[in-house]
């Protein structure tokens, strides 16, 4: 609850400025629409601006009154000044005082939630390690199954057109068969990864609940969103691996088909060139797939870091505490601010309701 109020003060001070600026530009825009309605529009715009500032002032005074338990005993809650500059300075002073008192609490909550999310990352790590090992084994398997170099192979390729055509057709069949076989091998790994995400994220929900400053409803939404994002990314990773194998099959098939056409025209066919092509294509498949698995692991880190900030914001001294309003896209920045405010209102409403319920029923937890 205390951490939420600190966030509210920080964001409300910005939000009041945004609202005032919005009313000013509405007032300015209305003045330029037509001279006939100018007087009436000026009056309406001025009333809108005044009402917006008065409402923001009222809201902020209400929040300052609720900071009583966090202040020194016997110290009356302040009333905000009536001028915008006075509001800004007074809010800044109050925010610094409350932030100092809440710093240890918020730091502890942020760290506790971070530990739980690190646990989730460690629980998912074996799945990606297993997947990378399977990629390496699959490349070795395909390398062996599609191997072309050997005394018998070279003699067959150089023995005549019919022998070379027969060997290349067999090679084409092996490419199709073994790439499809390897594709099937990856299905169980994808299923285990998706199942593991669902299971471990639910465990995270239970373990992080005592430490999150978010309301239970918002906590559930955040955890569900995390589960959906990671599940979608895991399925996308599986699709990418399947696509890589399709590309490997098509590239090798094309190369063999060109080689077959050359053999049919009695051109010489170098078995070493065919073997090198297979090796290079397999190395490219392994390299691309490793990068995609690494990107998936990085996505897990990014998503868990984001949810850590949502469930337990960092303390005021942390570089990520302040809202990012200096974004080049002002609409996106304001949208992010509005989303944070919506979350704060929900958490504050829950915190006040829970606190009021505890005060009215001091023995409610004991029966």
UniProtKB/Swiss-Prot annotation:
This is Apolipoprotein A-V. Pfam families: Apolipoprotein. Keywords: Chylomicron, Coiled coil, Endosome, Golgi apparatus, HDL, Lipid transport, Phosphoprotein, Secreted, Signal, Transport, VLDL. Residues 1-20 form the signal peptide. The lineage of its organism: Eukaryota, Metazoa, Chordata, Craniata, Vertebrata. One of its GO terms (biological process) is positive regulation of fatty acid biosynthetic process. It is found in: Secreted; Early endosome; Late endosome; Golgi apparatus, trans-Golgi network. Minor apolipoprotein mainly associated with HDL and to a lesser extent with VLDL. May also be associated with chylomicrons. Important determinant of plasma triglyceride (TG) levels by both being a potent stimulator of apo-CII lipoprotein lipase (LPL) TG hydrolysis and an inhibitor of the hepatic VLDL-TG production rate (without affecting the VLDL-apoB production rate). Activates poorly lecithin:cholesterol acyltransferase (LCAT) and does not enhance efflux of cholesterol from macrophages. Binds heparin. InterPro entries: ApoA_E, Apolipoprotein_A1/A4/E. Residues 231-255 form a coiled coil. Its main location: secreted. Liver. The keyword Kinase does not apply. It comes from the Eukaryota. GO terms for molecular function: cholesterol transfer activity; enzyme activator activity; enzyme binding; heparin binding; lipase activator activity; lipase binding; lipid binding; lipoprotein lipase activator activity. Belongs to the apolipoprotein A1/A4/E family. Induction: Induced in early phase of liver regeneration. Expression is maximally increased 6 hours after partial hepatectomy, both at the liver RNA level and at the plasma protein level. Residues 305-332 are annotated as: Disordered.
């Amino acid at each position: 609850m205390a951490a939420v109020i600190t966030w509210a003060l920080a964001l409300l001070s910005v939000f009041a400025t945004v609202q005032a600026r919005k009313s000013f530009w509405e007032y300015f825009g209305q003045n330029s629409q037509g001279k006939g309605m100018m007087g009436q529009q000026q009056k309406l715009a001025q009333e809108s601006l005044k009402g917006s500032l008065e409402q923001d002032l009222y809201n902020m005074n209400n929040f300052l009154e609720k900071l009583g338990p966090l202040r020194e005993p016997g110290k009356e809650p302040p009333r905000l000044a009536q001028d915008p500059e006075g509001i800004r300075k007074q809010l800044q002073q109050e925010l610094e005082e409350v932030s100092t008192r809440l710093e240890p609490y918020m730091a502890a909550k942020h760290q506790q939630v971070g530990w739980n999310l690190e646990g989730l990352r460690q629980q998912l790590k074996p799945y990606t390690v297993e997947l990378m090992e399977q990629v390496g084994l699959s490349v070795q398997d395909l390398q062996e199954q599609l191997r072309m170099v050997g005394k018998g192979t070279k003699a067959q390729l150089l023995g005549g057109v019919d022998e070379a055509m027969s060997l290349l057709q067999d090679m084409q069949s092996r490419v199709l068969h073994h790439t499809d076989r390897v594709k099937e091998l990856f299905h169980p790994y994808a299923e285990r990864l998706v199942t593991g995400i669902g299971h471990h994220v639910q465990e995270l929900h239970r373990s992080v609940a005592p430490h999150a400053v978010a309301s239970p409803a918002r906590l559930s939404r955040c955890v569900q969103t995390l589960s959906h994002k990671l599940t979608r990314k895991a399925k996308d990773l599986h699709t990418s691996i399947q696509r890589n194998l399709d590309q490997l099959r098509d590239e090798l098939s094309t190369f063999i088909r060109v080689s077959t056409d050359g053999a049919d025209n009695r051109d010489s066919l170098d078995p070493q060139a065919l073997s090198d092509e297979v090796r290079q294509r397999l190395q490219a498949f392994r390299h691309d797939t490793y990068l995609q698995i690494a990107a998936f692991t990085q996505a897990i880190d990014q998503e868990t870091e984001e949810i850590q900030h949502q469930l337990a914001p960092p303390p005021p001294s942390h570089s990520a505490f302040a809202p990012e309003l200096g974004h080049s896209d002002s609409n996106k920045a304001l949208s992010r601010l509005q989303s944070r405010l919506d979350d704060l209102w929900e958490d504050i409403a829950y915190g006040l309701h829970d606190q009021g319920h505890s005060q009215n029923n001091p023995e409610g937890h004991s029966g």
